């Protein structure tokens, strides 16, 4: 088992760039693989999750070169060119991959099976399987969780699907299946959620009609190849944004080339409403995505009630928001975040256990948390906490060391490599005192 020891650190500074966006990296491999011709991707995130997708696409017959860790060249086989992998496809810990592959493979001529690690095998899959079955797919789960068995050779039909919860993974799975359907497919979301799939499909030449929360996909004859530069992952930048707010020295902490897709940046809105000084500099476009540099300065934060509309736009960043809330003046209330309970861990329970161990006053709700902050002096006592094998829990409590009285020891951190290889080195480069070792 791997472990972090994060010593108290009082300031961070410098200029950094975070690794490429995980969501976009997954999708770049899948869409390039079923496109015509050769696609080039730079800024690719070579994390365990994305490498699981790369390995699976190769097993499905797609030739992929990797000139460097952050570059991939994908030789597309076309919409109908995937082939039987011959054995189960192992998604590792990648929830995005298993859900998107379920949609993509539901339209193929061959049978497939999707499996993963112990954590992934507990993740809910019926939310994806149900609309795909409505389209005519043969998708089977084991009591609602993986392994996922997909029968090949079924003709799919376009449907109108109203998502019961705002989930970009479910929406994307349906849209990938819809590429092969007879007739248009419409997905209606209950709230705004990530739109990377729509942006990337459009850049591949797919006709999409988008009106508010309603997205209609018209099946294409083919997907065009692309040259894609993946921006820095906002979810990875989130840890350093909060670090800068808690302890940036001098002129602040600069985070370069961060993807600022408006369906991902709810954390920016909530942190600014808490008094956070975050300047957006050099805004620009990178492919279909908005990108900018962020300058973060140390700020006196105040507790707020998080607007419900921002929750789906910040769902992966809520663990580190809880760290910021523990350092804010007054109370912070987050509700409507029940989706946290079915991530890599039950993130509400995992964060509560860590906050309890570190002496933070809080109360747990079924769909969120209420946190009483401590704006001056150490907000965290120090001690040992368990990440429950969840990368975002481990990294969030590492950031807490900026306001800790004593060392924070974090157990079970190997899964940080699923999303943020090199996290410890980057954290140390800005001034955090964190070390990784075998427990």
Report the location of each language-model feature.
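Structural preference for solvent-exposed beta-strand-turn elements
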Residues: 1-439
């Amino acid at each position: 088992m791997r472990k972090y020891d994060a010593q108290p650190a009082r300031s961070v500074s410098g200029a950094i760039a975070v690794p490429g966006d995980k969501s976009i990296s997954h999708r770049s491999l899948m869409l390039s693989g079923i496109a015509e011709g050769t696609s080039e991707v730079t800024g690719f995130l070579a994390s365990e999750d994305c490498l699981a997708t790369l390995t699976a696409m190769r097993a499905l017959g797609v030739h992929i070169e990797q000139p460097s860790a952050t570059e991939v060249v994908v030789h597309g086989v076309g919409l109908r060119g995937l082939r039987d992998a011959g054995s189960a496809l192992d998604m590792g810990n990648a929830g995005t991959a298993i859900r998107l592959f379920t949609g993509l493979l539901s339209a193929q001529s061959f049978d497939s099976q999707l499996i993963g690690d112990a954590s992934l095998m507990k993740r809910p899959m019926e939310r994806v399987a149900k609309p795909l079955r409505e389209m005519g797919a043969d998708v089977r789960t084991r009591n609602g969780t993986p392994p996922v068995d997909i029968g090949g050779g079924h003709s799919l039909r376009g449907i109108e699907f109203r998502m019961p919860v705002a989930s970009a993974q479910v929406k994307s799975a349906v849209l990938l299946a819809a590429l092969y359907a007879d007739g248009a497919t419409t997905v209606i979301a209950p709230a705004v959620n990530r739109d990377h799939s729509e942006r990337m499909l459009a850049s591949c030449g797919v006709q999409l009609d988008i009106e508010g929360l309603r997205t209609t996909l018209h099946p294409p004859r083919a997907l065009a190849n692309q040259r894609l530069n993946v921006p820095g992952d906002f979810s990875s930048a989130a840890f350093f944004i909060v670090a800068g707010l808690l302890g940036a020295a001098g002129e602040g902490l600069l985070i370069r080339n961060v993807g600022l897709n408006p369906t991902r940046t709810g954390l920016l809105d909530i942190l600014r409403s808490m008094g956070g000084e975050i300047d957006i500099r050099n805004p620009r476009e990178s492919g279909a995505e908005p990108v900018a540099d962020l300058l973060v300065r140390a700020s006196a934060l105040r507790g707020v009630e998080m607007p419900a509309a921002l929750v789906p736009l910040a769902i992966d960043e809520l663990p580190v928001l809880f760290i910021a809330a523990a350092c804010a003046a007054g109370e912070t209330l987050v509700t409507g975040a029940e989706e946290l309970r079915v991530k890599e861990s039950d993130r509400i329970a995992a964060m509560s256990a860590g906050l309890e161990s570190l002496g933070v006053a809080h109360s747990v709700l079924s769909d969120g948390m209420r946190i009483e902050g401590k704006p001056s002096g150490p907000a965290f006592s120090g001690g040992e906490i368990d990440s429950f094998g969840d990368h975002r829990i481990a990294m969030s409590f590492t950031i807490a060391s900026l306001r800790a009285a004593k060392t924070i020891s974090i157990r079970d951190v190997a899964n940080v490599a699923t999303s943020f290889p090199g996290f410890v080195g980057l954290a140390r480069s800005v001034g955090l005192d964190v070390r990784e070792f075998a427990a």
